[in-house]
Amino acid sequence: MAPARGRLPPALWVVTAAAAAATCVSAARGEVNLLDTSTIHGDWGWLTYPAHGWDSINEVDESFQPIHTYQVCNVMSPNQNNWLRTSWVPRDGARRVYAEIKFTLRDCNSMPGVLGTCKETFNLYYLESDRDLGASTQESQFLKIDTIAADESFTGADLGVRRLKLNTEVRSVGPLSKRGFYLAFQDIGACLAILSLRIYYKKCPAMVRNLAAFSEAVTGADSSSLVEVRGQCVRHSEERDTPKMYCSAEGEWLVPIGKCVCSAGYEERRDACVACELGFYKSAPGDQLCARCPPHSHSAAPAAQACHCDLSYYRAALDPPSSACTRPPSAPVNLISSVNGTSVTLEWAPPLDPGGRSDITYNAVCRRCPWALSRCEACGSGTRFVPQQTSLVQASLLVANLLAHMNYSFWIEAVNGVSDLSPEPRRAAVVNITTNQAAPSQVVVIRQERAGQTSVSLLWQEPEQPNGIILEYEIKYYEKDKEMQSYSTLKAVTTRATVSGLKPGTRYVFQVRARTSAGCGRFSQAMEVETGKPRPRYDTRTIVWICLTLITGLVVLLLLLICKKRHCGYSKAFQDSDEEKMHYQNGQAPPPVFLPLHHPPGKLPEPQFYAEPHTYEEPGRAGRSFTREIEASRIHIEKIIGSGDSGEVCYGRLRVPGQRDVPVAIKALKAGYTERQRRDFLSEASIMGQFDHPNIIRLEGVVTRGRLAMIVTEYMENGSLDTFLRTHDGQFTIMQLVGMLRGVGAGMRYLSDLGYVHRDLAARNVLVDSNLVCKVSDFGLSRVLEDDPDAAYTTTGGKIPIRWTAPEAIAFRTFSSASDVWSFGVVMWEVLAYGERPYWNMTNRDVISSVEEGYRLPAPMGCPHALHQLMLDCWHKDRAQRPRFSQIVSVLDALIRSPESLRATATVSRCPPPAFVRSCFDLRGGSGGGGGLTVGDWLDSIRMGRYRDHFAAGGYSSLGMVLRMNAQDVRALGITLMGHQKKILGSIQTMRAQLTSTQGPRRHL
């Protein structure tokens, strides 16, 4: 068929392009072809428009293989618009596809006469549809993809030598959303041949990564989008973290996240999990490989998660699967015994075969054999094992409380962590012993059968362990509290006896012990019996005199009570009118009396009488009566926590057999002491030994044997009260501080009831335990007042400052419970001031003169009014007007029960001490200052010297400037601790009050 008008014959160049069609290759890996014309034999079935545009040409290449192309070459005519449309292509789920076009294009310059009409480009279009539209498509429906130009074009010379210049262009199409699409080529005047068209989309291939299988995934709609794909763990594996990968637009897997690990019993091998072989195991999922079974174990099947122990071997419940299987130990060896009376010490060596374990302990089995070793029975609960009978760690044991002349068999078993798993009997070492002769045990039960005026009949039970035939009983008796002077004994052959020849109306103490051929046992507990009183026989005159005497005594007693009630103003404040009671309770009625804070219910101390150790004729008798001797070997000193002139105070532990060590404080007398120093030192222990109260330091015992001299007391973790408060400045509530004072007051009430005068009550002599319980301590020796006006009462342990002592005790050396009350008021001030030194930096001489002139310490910062009023009452000049300790405790109890009464704080209204005013500079001198204290001295006096630089940097060079400071000024100096702010402001407030009242009248209390 002749060529159309304006067209060049295509056969001239189709033949040269035939070889190019054969170069079409299959889709690359990761690419899925939707259309590939190189695989179509014959006509492609595409539509052309108009009819004289594109031509379908079927030729053969040089290999005589058929080849089909679409060609157009209407270069002679202008305004060409020739369309070539593909068949409908299903999308197959792809969001974006790629068109790979292979074509040839002739150079316009190689054709004469076509410069105005020849083009070297063509356009590519696409149209989406959900079905095949047939031939009913319109040009306007298509969307342009791109204008395509050839990288290389051929000329007439190329045709002559059959040289092919093939162009390959790839364009992306999308995003697509409908079921299929068409591609269309628009020719606008080029000499062009389409050799092949491949339409494909990209996908990420299926793969296994990190033991997770990822299925193939189609790329996203955009060239930059990533499609997330979640993997599935391969067989016998489990997720460690969720496995995910991202499929890129180029069909490549990116960014692996998470992974799977092989399950227990399986290990990874070439992207798969394979079972552990026989003899191997894996106990937990993970990356680790299967491990060989530990010693003495095996795996029964592949994929073992644990190895089973061999016969007679075991694994304890807490042993990991990786541990070797072990077995019970063999018996201990070299078991030896050492008999001492009715006790035996057993020692042995560890077993030769520990069974592969190190957790070996020992159990002791005791069997008593009265008749023969073949007929034994359990020893019973009375036998004592030290340290214990089972779970022994050390290879030694003491067995006590055995019967005398008795055969025993002891079995020592060695056990370890798998002994309970073995059905076999435990292996033990055996030793047989016979106890020696021993004295009988203590007589436990003794009771009074009858008591007359001059005789007492007693009845008791035989000892639980007679340890032989009891030959007789010995009864020891004496008048109460006269054992050291004389006592008597009586023999009896039965468990009953009558003691005669006693004094009528006298209290006697009786003790009984048994005797065998081995000796005497211990005496029983003491039992007190009072003999009957004789019947009095009086005549009428005697009876009349007795009645008159009783009546006179009652009258005198009544007068004394009336006198006491009128003169004891403090008692009236508590017992008369409600108006007086409001003085301490802010208008609230006092609460009923309740148990002390530090006593458990129903356990109040029993009243007794204090005995002065120096009144004993024999100095050592007081120590034996009131103290307990402790063996020095039971005390282990760990560190020194204090020292003084007479000795050192140490922290240590007291070993108690069968119990935990007790932490104690040990006061040891220094070497080189005299006998008088030793006697005075131990006299303090004799004093402490008489006290039993939860707010009095408890004496554990003394060490007096040999050259050692030590006093052992309970250990108080927080040390002295003054140091403790200074360390925790501002950290307690008012209620907590009142609770501490209540504890000190309760202890002093107890001492006062006993008739004991402390003479040195101060915060430094009050100790605090871990529960904030305060206990009175330091029961020192006699004190001597020197003639020096600055003197302090001295003891061998040091000086007692004047500022804690009552005026009458300083002036007349008169110490009483009332002088202790004065000291308690100072302790109250110390507690509320958090360990502040009373009277600051005043000398002892100034303190004495100021107190005599009526000065009293002002209320500390934030001190409730009720507490400061109680201090002032304790500092009453007339000691008869001071409260008793029982009344002080009642006031503190009332304040604790009525917290609202502690809200009103006291204001500083007392006059300053004249000595203090004289020692200071003229505060009214402004910033110029005077000739006395500096700002640094003032800060040192209130223990705030650390802030010297702060005040200097703030420009406060004199106390005159300091007096004008407020809370904001103090904070501006960088003082952030609330307790320190309160202390500084409180001192400033005190100085202001002292300044304003310096010229005012003084009054005595």
From Swiss-Prot:
Q: Is Membrane there in the keyword field?
A: yes
Name the residues annotated as catalytic in the UniProt entry: D760
Stretches assigned to the Fibronectin type-III domain: 328-438, 439-534
Catalytic activity reads:
L-tyrosyl-[protein] + ATP = O-phospho-L-tyrosyl-[protein] + ADP + H(+)
The Protein kinase domain, residue ranges: 635-896
Look up the signal peptide feature and give its range: 1-27
Q: How is it modified after translation?
A: Phosphorylated. Phosphorylation is stimulated upon binding of its ligands including EFNA2, EFNA3 and EFNA5. Autophosphorylation on Tyr-616 is critical for association with FYN. Autophosphorylation on Tyr-839 modulates tyrosine kinase activity. Ubiquitinated. Ubiquitination by CBL regulates the receptor stability and activity through proteasomal degradation. ANKS1A prevents ubiquitination and degradation.
Per the UniProt topology annotation, the Extracellular ranges are 28-542
- Spans annotated as Mediates interaction with ANKS1A and ANKS1B: 564-570
* Sites where the protein binds ATP: I641, G642, S643, G644, D645, S646, G647, E648, V649, K667
Q: Name one GO biological process term.
A: axon guidance
Q: Which domain of life is it from?
A: Eukaryota
Q: In what residue span(s) does the Eph LBD domain sit?
A: 31-209
Bilayer topology reads:
Single-pass type I membrane protein
SUPFAM superfamilies in the cross-refs: Fibronectin type III, Galactose-binding domain-like, Protein kinase-like (PK-like), SAM/Pointed domain
Provide the residue span(s) of the region labelled Mediates interaction with PIK3CG and required for endocytosis. Answer: 589-644
Q: Which residues carry this modification: Phosphotyrosine?
A: Y616, Y839
Keywords on record: ATP-binding, Cell adhesion, Cell membrane, Cell projection, Developmental protein, Endosome, Glycoprotein, Kinase, Membrane, Neurogenesis, Nucleotide-binding, Phosphoprotein, Receptor, Repeat, Signal, Transferase, Transmembrane, Transmembrane helix, Tyrosine-protein kinase, Ubl conjugation
UniProt family annotation? Belongs to the protein kinase superfamily. Tyr protein kinase family. Ephrin receptor subfamily.
How is the subunit organization of this protein annotated in UniProt?
A: Heterotetramer upon binding of the ligand. The heterotetramer is composed of an ephrin dimer and a receptor dimer. Oligomerization is probably required to induce biological responses. May also form heterodimers with other ephrin receptors. Interacts with FYN; possible downstream effector of EPHA8 in regulation of cell adhesion. Interacts with PIK3CG; regulates integrin-mediated cell adhesion to substrate. Interacts with TIAM1; regulates clathrin-mediated endocytosis of EPHA8. Interacts with ANKS1A and ANKS1B; EPHA8 kinase activity-independent but stimulated by EPHA8 ubiquitination.
Protein name, entry field: Ephrin type-A receptor 8
* Species of the source: Homo sapiens (Human)
